[in-house]
């Protein structure tokens, strides 16, 4: 079993004389910056001058600087902007100002693992990846709790990088829940696999296929929406709360029997073969190359596929159904 680190096992001392720059002030960036500041750390928020993030960070009492200025004043530089934006920012506004013994931090391993960012040998490189969205990271911290996280060390120039990563995790509240050690390779490949095969790609494809099957068989789209999409949350919440066996204790015997006898006919050995193929595409860098190229040429395939799904009947029906449920309206 993996080793899990908690509050009492981790010291903030290694960060006591450090200045931490957070690049970005979005969902994760804001949470990390505020939590670290409240943990007594010296924090600089580095964002585009006079943009919305700049103004918000100032309003919330943060020290705000241009990225290149912040890098020169910092000991730790944490990248909390989208993966696709990081390489250019690193090349133009971070790399020219790096000095020995600084540390580069990431919340996802993609750019390091796939060599989109190649750090010089004289810096530390680590990752702290909370397993929850930024607002939850902040809210639980304020409540005296925390969101679990993964941490990893890629390059340990100072021989203190592991301590720095753990202290950073404690600073954002993660050790209150527990942090698990991994590698950049493991985090990147499993994260991409989970997104593509289960959490995003797998789930949305399954929902659409089920919805289409019922509608094509003559059932009302509204009823198909309820059965194939709306009720998904009820089941996933139970699984999230206590696991698959816990969920099965909460459903009818009829549903349970259908689950264990029909489910394996949908996700079968052929499905697993395709899963293994997708995993191999992640491991050998094929997916990364494809996604990087897609961004370089303006995302034509990506945008077309998104548009196709946005025009799907399930979206039109869902909009009508959700009007009946005002409590589901997204918070702005």
From Swiss-Prot:
Pathway: Amino-acid biosynthesis; L-isoleucine biosynthesis; L-isoleucine from 2-oxobutanoate: step 2/4; Amino-acid biosynthesis; L-valine biosynthesis; L-valine from pyruvate: step 2/4. One of its GO terms (biological process) is isoleucine biosynthetic process. Its EC number is 1.1.1.86. The active site is at 108. GO terms for molecular function: ketol-acid reductoisomerase activity; magnesium ion binding; NADP binding. Residues 183-328 form the KARI C-terminal knotted domain. Keywords: Amino-acid biosynthesis, Branched-chain amino acid biosynthesis, Magnesium, Metal-binding, NADP, Oxidoreductase. Binds 2 magnesium ions per subunit. Mg(2+) 1 binds at residues 191, 195. Involved in the biosynthesis of branched-chain amino acids (BCAA). Catalyzes an alkyl-migration followed by a ketol-acid reduction of (S)-2-acetolactate (S2AL) to yield (R)-2,3-dihydroxy-isovalerate. In the isomerase reaction, S2AL is rearranged via a Mg-dependent methyl migration to produce 3-hydroxy-3-methyl-2-ketobutyrate (HMKB). In the reductase reaction, this 2-ketoacid undergoes a metal-dependent reduction by NADPH to yield (R)-2,3-dihydroxy-isovalerate. This is Ketol-acid reductoisomerase (NADP(+)). It comes from Dictyoglomus thermophilum (strain ATCC 35947 / DSM 3960 / H-6-12). The gene is ilvC.
């Amino acid at each position: 079993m993996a080793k899990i680190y908690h509050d009492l096992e981790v010291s903030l001392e290694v960060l006591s004389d450090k200045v931490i720059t957070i690049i970005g002030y979005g969902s994760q960036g804001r949470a990390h910056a505020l939590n670290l500041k409240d943990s007594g750390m010296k924090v600089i928020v580095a964002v585009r001058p006079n943009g919305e993030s700049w103004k918000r960070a100032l309003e919330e009492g943060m020290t705000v600087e241009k990225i290149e200025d912040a890098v020169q004043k910092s000991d730790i530089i944490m990248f909390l902007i989208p993966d696709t934006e990081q390489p250019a920012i690193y090349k133009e506004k971070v790399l020219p100002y790096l000095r020995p013994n600084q540390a580069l931090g990431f919340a996802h391993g993609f750019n390091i693992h796939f060599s989109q960012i190649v750090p010089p040998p004289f810096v530390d490189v680590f990752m702290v990846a909370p397993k929850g969205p930024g607002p939850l990271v902040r809210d639980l911290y304020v409540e005296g709790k925390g969101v679990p996280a993964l941490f990893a060390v890629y390059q340990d120039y100072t021989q203190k990088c592991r301590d720095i990563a753990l202290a950073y995790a404690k600073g954002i509240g993660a050790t209150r829940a527990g942090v698990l050690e991994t590698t950049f390779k493991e985090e990147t490949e499993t994260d991409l696999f989970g997104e593509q095969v289960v959490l995003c790609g797998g789930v949305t494809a399954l929902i659409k296929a089920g919805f289409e099957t019922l509608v094509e068989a003559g059932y009302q789209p509204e009823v198909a929406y309820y059965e194939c999409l709306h009720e998904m949350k009820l089941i996933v919440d139970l699984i999230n709360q206590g696991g698959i066996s816990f969920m099965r204790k909460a459903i009818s015997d009829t549903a349970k029997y259908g689950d264990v006898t029909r489910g394996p006919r949908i996700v079968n050995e052929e499905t697993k073969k395709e899963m293994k193929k997708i995993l191999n595409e992640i491991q050998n860098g094929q997916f990364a190359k494809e996604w990087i190229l897609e961004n370089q040429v303006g995302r034509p395939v990506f945008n077309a596929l998104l548009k196709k799904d946005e025009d799907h009947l399930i979206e039109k029906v869902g909009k009508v159904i959700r009007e009946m449920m005002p409590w589901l309206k997204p918070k702005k």
